[in-house]
């Protein structure tokens, strides 16, 4: 009887093992879940590292002319990001062309030299400032030319857009500070932790976003109390006068986590600085981090003519004329999205 029980037990065991072996593999081994990472933390560290390095925020058209054109200094590498049409009509001699909408693409940026100072040229300096921030995060030494082609020439045909404004709007400023709030940080779920790949993905996602807001449009939003204002100037200049309702976070500390919690992730943010260049870089960094931001075109220098409030010179259209080259056809056809 005992042997019979053992025999029956062995038969049952073999039957069970045989049944298990016939189960589909998917029932035996569960699929591994896709691991997602918070890209925000990775990109924030890169943005903070960049701002803490005290980057050069712009280079004057005069320096570009003196060094790159007159002295033919080979360390300067000029990239024009305006439209194909405007580049073809007039551009600074020696500059190559990459359209603004293509500035995030590997096949446009991988060949750029890492041992030269890349000067980025657009219409007014704002789009080039955004691209400069992006390319700097990729490891390039990139600097926008101040005021773009509008700082090179007063001729609208040469610029391809509006020339420099000749005077400030003289809109009101206040000294009272607005109490801030605390917000959750954005989350950017992604499968990769590679910073360069994350930058490319975010660059593509925000390529078509507006770059600037005009002072008149911003004034209307301020009057309607329908805007979140971020002033990134130095504390002393902010205290001397700022746009009503603005929150002050100086540029260098903008990407610190404690400061980013002061910004709403679900509300448009207008970034204000001295002349629009630093604000444009800040706006690009914030957009990469998942915020929705634009820069005030020409910054406080067009909002008010009071240099004590601005912390810098007011806008001026008094610039010398400089040479340009012409082409019969675009050197590098690109998409229609234009720089500003």
Where are these regions (language model features)?
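Short, compositionally biased "basic patch" segments
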Residues: 28-37, 72-87, 226-238
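Bacterial N-terminal signal peptides that target proteins for export
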Residues: 1-8
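Rhodanese-like catalytic fold shared by cysteine-dependent sulfurtransferases
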Residues: 20-59, 70, 88-117, 126-212, ...
């Amino acid at each position: 009887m005992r042997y019979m029980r053992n025999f029956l037990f062995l038969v049952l065991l073999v039957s069970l093992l045989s049944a298990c072996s016939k189960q589909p593999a998917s029932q035996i081994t569960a699929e591994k879940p896709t691991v997602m990472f918070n890209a925000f933390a990775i990109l924030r560290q890169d943005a903070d590292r960049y701002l803490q390095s005290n980057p050069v925020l712009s280079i004057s058209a005069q320096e570009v002319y003196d060094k790159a054109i007159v002295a033919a200094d080979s360390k300067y590498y000029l990239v024009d990001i305006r439209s194909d049409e405007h580049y073809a009509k007039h551009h600074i001699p020696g500059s190559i062309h990459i359209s603004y909408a293509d500035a995030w693409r590997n096949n446009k940026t991988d060949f750029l030299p890492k041992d030269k100072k890349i000067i980025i040229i657009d219409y007014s300096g704002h789009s080039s400032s955004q691209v400069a921030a992006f390319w700097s995060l990729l490891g390039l030494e990139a600097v926008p030319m101040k005021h773009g082609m509008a700082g090179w020439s007063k001729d609208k045909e040469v610029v391809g857009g509006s020339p420099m404004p000749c005077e400030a709007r003289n809109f009101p400023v206040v000294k009272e500070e607005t109490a801030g709030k605390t917000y959750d940080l954005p989350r950017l779920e992604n499968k990769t932790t590679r910073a360069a790949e994350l930058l490319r993905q975010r660059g593509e996602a925000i390529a078509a976003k507006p770059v600037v807001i005009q002072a008149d449009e911003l004034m209307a939003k301020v009057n309607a109390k329908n805007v979140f204002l971020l002033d990134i100037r130095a504390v002393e200049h902010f205290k001397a006068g700022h746009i009503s309702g603005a929150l002050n976070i100086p540029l260098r500390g903008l990407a610190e986590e404690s400061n980013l919690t002061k910004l709403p992730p679900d509300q448009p943010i207008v970034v204000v600085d001295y002349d629009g260049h630093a604000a444009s870089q800040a706006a690009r960094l914030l957009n990469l981090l998942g915020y929705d931001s634009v820069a005030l075109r020409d910054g406080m220098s067009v909002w008010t003519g009071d240099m004590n409030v601005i912390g810098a010179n007011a806008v001026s259209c008094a610039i010398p004329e400089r040479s340009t080259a012409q082409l019969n056809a675009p050197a590098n056809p690109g998409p229609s999205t234009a720089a500003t």
